[in-house]
Amino acid sequence: VSTVNLSEAQSKLVRTGFPPDDAWESALTFCNEIISFDSSQARLAGGMIATTQPLGLSLGDRACLALAMLLKAPVYTTDRLWKKLSFDLEIRLLR
């Protein structure tokens, strides 16, 4: 998981009332590997804005997609809109 997405997960938990440190520890429980957001990911994520903005995707969403592209890994999401993307990625819906 990208450090950007880990931060997003922590933020969502804090918004629901978790103390920040507890939210961080809870978010970590779902991570097998944490990958720092770097310039390669930033370049890909930034270049996706025209395609992803009409679907309402966030920087965190684009960071996730960029990391998957670089790793040639599938992306798991609950957001059905991602299936409309025309990137060379395997997008798997969780529900």
Predicted regions: what is each one?
Residues 78-82:
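Short, polar loop motifs at secondary-structure junctions
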Residues 1-55, 63-73, 85-88:
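PIN-domain endoribonuclease scaffold, especially VapC-family toxins
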Residues 60:
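Glycine-rich, Arg-bearing micro-motifs that act as flexible, cationic patches
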